[in-house]
Curated annotation (Swiss-Prot):
It holds the Pfam family HNF-1B_C. GO terms for cellular component: nucleus. Disulfide bonds: none annotated. It is found in: Nucleus. The keyword Transcription regulation applies. The lineage of its organism: Eukaryota, Metazoa, Chordata, Craniata, Vertebrata. PROSITE patterns: HNF_P1, HOMEOBOX_2, POU_4. This is Hepatocyte nuclear factor 1-beta. Transcription factor that binds to the inverted palindrome 5'-GTTAATNATTAAC-3'. Binds to the FPC element in the cAMP regulatory unit of the PLAU gene. Transcriptional activity is increased by coactivator PCBD1. Residues 231-312 bind DNA. Its main location: nucleus. Residues 353-371 have a biased composition (Polar residues). Residues 328-371 are annotated as: Disordered.
């Protein structure tokens, strides 16, 4: 006899035999692993009470044979993921109350399904549940299975114990019989149907009345099995056929009339019956899945609410996106890491002046100084411009300017929001100034490094109460490098003063020399060291000017 084993199988058998395992042990192990034909649920007619009466009352008794030795559980291949002990399912105990013929038929059908492929049976049960809109929760309540394990078994074919599969198949067989009985049930009269539907609605709303309607014998039976969970009512679930009809009707009319809703009820029930493979005249057999006019009304009301909520969400998202875009634009403009461009000076992306003449000079300087908080290093753009070329009707910067000036006292608004520079229109067209965009503290640091005294006329863009004002001239007339002079960078306790104290401090300055518009250009002895400058700064930096002594007078004009 030619062996049908492969070389690998022969090696495995040889290794088992050489390890000391006898033939009898191998045969016994094979019998335990392989399912026997007597697997499943078997029925026997045993007397209910052997010691009472001569005529025994026979009822079906179920024995779940898990293996040849009737052990309590199977091997690891049939084990569940949760690993909990699973006693006799409640549904098997309830099956004892059925008639003998029905119980025998159900047991035979369950035994047949247990002998087949579990994955094939799982797909069949899943399709039946989808066809009749049966939720998995109903199966869990009846069989006591774990819902996660049941879902994995139906969807992915996860192995399940034979005892659990027997409970699942028993539910499936009983559900088929129950649904078939519902559709084959005949109604005596329309009045009886109305009374039954009214009673069902009352029990649907008040399930506690169903317990009161039970007889004393049924109550005793219910109390004798406290382990059974209380059955919850099945929640109505729209089928795919009905949803397709309702969505098409919603596209035509969002708020149908009562007559239109009743027509939709008939159409939906007809579609549900066709989905289940029964005649539309047996729509009463749908049970909890029966479509009513109230359910259609609620469906349309819910769709209208969802549509309105979706519109509001879209509006809020659009508003939020606009706000975020504006904030990102502002942050990108206020970024201190501005990359200089290699384009001509009149096309700088950061700063652009409308000017005439060929005296354009573009350079970059780095100003470093130490303050009370940190070192400030700023990149400045210097341009030799003619103030007369700045039209009073135009802003200092073009609207598309992107350069922002950040100072130690906090970020400033975009420079493009400056007011009209109307004070420059009185200057001499031949006058030229260097415009330095840097904090005032940086200008003071430069001033301390000079070796000569000189009078300066610095137009200052003042920031009062958090907003930018127009150019304000500041005149310096002091010895900038005296040994006894205190550092100008020292911050006073009242540096963050309000607008009113600031104006009062300015008006109290002695020997103030207000800026007068002269037609002749000013003469400086050291123009290459510290030329006139325009300082873009905030209130916290300008307030340091008020702490200067009488030899360091800085009259300001603010409005």
């Amino acid at each position: 006899m030619v062996s049908k084993l492969t070389s690998l199988q022969q090696e495995l058998l040889s290794a088992l035999l050489s390890s000391g395992v006898t033939k009898e042990v191998l045969v016994q192990a094979l019998e335990e692993l392989l399912p026997s034909p007597s697997f499943g649920v078997k029925l026997e007619t045993l007397p209910l009470s052997p010691g009472s009466g001569t005529e025994p009352d026979t009822k079906p008794v179920f024995h779940t044979l898990t293996n040849g030795h009737a052990k309590g559980r199977l091997s690891g291949d049939e084990g569940s993921e949760d690993g909990d002990d699973y006693d006799t399912p409640p549904i098997l105990k309830e099956l004892q109350a059925l008639n003998t013929e029905e119980a025998a038929d159900d047991g035979a059908e369950v035994d047949r399904m247990l002998s087949e492929d579990p994955w094939r049976a799982a797909k069949m049960i899943k399709g039946y549940m989808q066809q009749h809109n049966i939720p998995q929760r109903e199966v869990v309540d009846v069989t006591g299975l774990n819902q996660s394990h049941l879902s994995q078994h139906l969807n992915k074919g996860t192995p399940m114990k034979t005892q659990k599969r027997a409970a699942l198949y028993t539910w499936y067989v009983r559900k088929q019989r129950e649904i078939l009985r519902q559709f084959n049930q005949t109604v005596q009269s329309s009045g009886n149907l109305t009374d039954k539907s009214s009673q069902d609605q009352l029990l649907f709303l008040f399930p506690e009345f169903s317990q009161q309607s039970q007889g004393p014998g049924q109550s005793d039976d219910a109390c004798s099995e406290p382990t059974n969970k209380k059955m919850r009512r099945n929640r109505f679930k729209w089928g795919p056929a009905s949803q397709q009809i309702l969505y098409q009707a919603y596209d035509r009319q969002k708020n149908p009339s009562k007559e239109e809703r009743e027509a939709l009820v008939e159409e939906c029930n007809r579609a549900e019956c066709l989905q289940r493979g029964v005649s539309p005249s047996k729509a009463h057999g749908l049970g909890s899945n029966l479509v009513t006019e109230v359910r259609v009304y609620n469906w349309f009301a819910n769709r209208r609410k969802e549509e309105e909520a979706f519109r509001q969400k879209l509006a809020m998202d659009a508003y939020s996106s606009n706000q975020t875009h504006s904030l990102n634009t502002l942050l990108s403009h206020s970024s201190p890491h501005h990359q200089p461009s290699t384009s001509p000076p009149n096309k700088l992306p950061g700063v652009r002046y409308n000017q005439q003449g060929n005296n354009e000079v573009t350079s970059s300087s780095t100003i470093s100084h130490h303050g009370n908080s940190a070192m400030v290093t700023s990149q400045s753009v210097l341009q030799q411009v003619s103030p007369a070329s700045l039209d009073p009707g135009h802003n200092l910067l073009s609207p598309d300017g992107k350069m922002q000036i950040s100072v130690s006292g906090g970020g400033l608004p975009p420079v493009s929001t400056l007011t009209n520079i109307h004070s420059l229109s009185h200057h001499n067209p031949q006058q030229s100034q260097n415009l330095i965009m840097t904090p005032l503290s940086g200008v003071m640091a430069i001033a301390q490094s000079l070796n000569s005294s000189q009078a300066q006329s610095v137009p200052v863009i003042n920031s009062v109460a958090g907003s930018l004002a127009a150019l304000q001239p500041v005149q310096f007339s002091q010895q900038l490098h005296s040994p006894h002079q205190q550092p100008l960078m020292q911050q006073s306790p009242g540096s963050h003063m309000a607008q009113q104290p600031f104006m009062a401090a300015v008006t109290q300055l002695q020997n103030s020399h207000m800026y007068t518009h002269k037609q002749e250009p000013p003469q400086y002895s050291h123009t290459s060291r510290f030329p006139p400058a325009m300082v873009v700064t905030d209130t916290s930096s300008i307030s340091t000017l008020t702490n200067m002594s009488s030899s360091k007078q800085c009259p300001l004009q603010a409005w």
